[in-house]
């Protein structure tokens, strides 16, 4: 995890979000909470102030209390944020990986969560279901396979514990190998997430290919006025 840039701006934005009760003192939402935990850990690393690590740990405890389920973690606290998204869970696994640098129990929690969600979400040889029912009893109506979910899981699993999650990693790698050659991402968030993931294992074939392809797509999407189309 690299140090933050422009700390003053980050702190101003974080203070504003607190004042507006957006985050971390707003309603729980797993995607935002995962990124926020990583941000707080980065602030702790950069500024060496214990309050940021303490707040990250508080967010983790709140997520468990509010969104935690017998298997997995609900999408969000609002009534319409039911079900479970695999890519949200994968980002949460990454946040637990980051916190495991300070307390090994978070690696154990991450491994346990990965094992709990893997089988319900993953259809070997086909893909990773994008959204599941809240109890993981089956796919959420109207949802199929996610385009990047196998990549999400592969990266998060490997960062957490390659030995403990070896069978799950192998299944994700097989899915990646089957789809990476044909996958073309044209959506801005997807491009950003793919480029972020390629940094962790940059020499692997899928990472080399997708980094080149994603950067090329960004060049084609860039408009002279300074916007993406």
Regions found by a protein language model. Give the residues of each.
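Glycan-recognition and catalytic cores of secretory/periplasmic carbohydrate-active enzymes
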Residues: 1-229
